[in-house]
């Protein structure tokens, strides 16, 4: 490994430490920006549109999610194609309020892939449309109280729940799902485009850099599963322990694993990413496991997971002959902004 590569990895690991250390301020800045953007978007809607967008925070609709096309999983909300230009701009302002520039580019590029799929799948059963992504708001956007928002459609499921309370975090941001089909565009004007390239390349760099004995621990199967294992379940439990522990890795490979995690956290605004990283570090980096299933050669079907005490990353690239990516971030105690303690007390009261 070159000195330059080593330096980059060391810097990446150091940045994770710095960001995590600053997370005690939580996500108040992003929460305020979200409230302003969501209120502006709501104010731009007609009464009929608002009826499609606005739901109570306690609505079961907030817990419904999937990453498949709308035809097979009908969603509620307002589609981009049904917005005027002002409303579209305000909707994108809301999307930007929770995402980094990198994350926003990924999400909008995934939407654009629908146009490419429309060409590839001429006469297919799905009506591919880059504007068939739906925005929904739960509760009343404000500096206090509990509220949230969601953007969903094929291969995009992004949500945030905002809370003021001493027990919960200020902002929760999972499940977050991003997918691409094709994972790599292989013809046409966008040939070579890989929207989720970092998610694949960072993990492959890690597995290929492992010493032989550690690689044997990490690669737990020659066959990759057909999809992410947690699918669109609302409530998940940790996967069985498998793979190699962070604590067992040499320093350079620890930096590579930190880089994989950073690829996912960096989709969020910086303060939300810092909060995620602070949780991870507080729970113990040494307890994180990395597992790879499938072949390690580029272009072959593969899957990996990164799991710690508080979170799970899953990445699967098996469909379309290894050219169709599904990736997700889950929080064991924080999906959908759940306040585990308060839910427990609520159940005990019955």
What are these regions, as identified by a protein language model?
Residues 25-350:
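A cross-kingdom marker for long, charged
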